[in-house]
Design a protein with these regions (language model features):
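Hydrophobic transmembrane alpha-helices
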Residues: 1-58
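Small-polar-interrupted transmembrane alpha-helices in polytopic inner-membrane proteins
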Residues: 19, 60-68
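Membrane-embedded alpha-helical hairpins and interfacial helices in multi-pass inner-membrane proteins
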Residues: 24-36, 65-178
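Membrane-helix interface "capping/anchor" motifs
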Residues: 49-61, 98-106
Length: 178
């Protein structure tokens, strides 16, 4: 029992480290600005992993917080809102997992809902921080679609990667994927 707990902590530390490295390595695409239309945070591919096993959620939440702490120009607002949004995504995957559908349908639905809520939450955050005009609605729509499109692309890539990877029975066993 104790070894499983240590194993889970180690897996989460690895996931957090990978999330941080990929977010910072691809920082120009990981963080939205007024000038960048589509936010492509490559590390969000790991978010799909929590659909298959929720125990990897803490690593993603920690990774998101540290990546935003180290790389985001938005400061404390992004540390809090970005981390909250990641936690909400994990919760959505946990809820969608209970639907009476095939796993593939559930992960696709969960990813779509997550991309929508990410666009709404992060789009609102970016509008609040960057919009310096009275045209908030137009600015928000641009930010929403930029984040939504980027997130849906990344989550689809994540679905493909994990669906293919988890055909390997040994990997499924190692990562406790049912």
């Amino acid at each position: 029992m104790k070894n499983k707990r240590v194993e889970t902590i180690v897996f989460n530390a690895i996931i957090a480290a990978i999330y941080i490295v990929f977010t910072l390595l691809f920082a120009p695409f990981s963080y939205s600005t007024k000038l960048l239309f589509i936010e492509l945070r490559i590390s969000e591919i790991l978010l799909v992993l929590t659909f298959y096993n929720k125990k990897y959620g803490p690593g993603l939440i920690l990774g998101c917080f540290v990546a935003n702490l180290l790389g985001s120009d938005l400061g404390p607002i992004d540390w809090l809102i970005g981390t909250f949004q990641t936690a909400l995504s994990i919760l959505i995957y946990m809820c969608v997992k209970k639907l009476p559908l095939s796993n593939l349908k559930k992960v696709v639905i969960g990813s779509f809902v997550n991309a929508l809520q990410c666009g709404l939450i992060i789009g609102s955050e970016l509008t609040y921080v960057y919009c310096d005009s009275s045209n908030y609605f137009s600015f928000f729509i641009l930010q929403f679609f930029g984040v939504f499109i980027g997130e849906i692309i990344i989550l689809i890539i994540g679905i493909v990667i994990f669906e293919i990877s988890f055909k390997n029975k040994e990997l499924r066993r190692l990562m406790e994927i049912k």
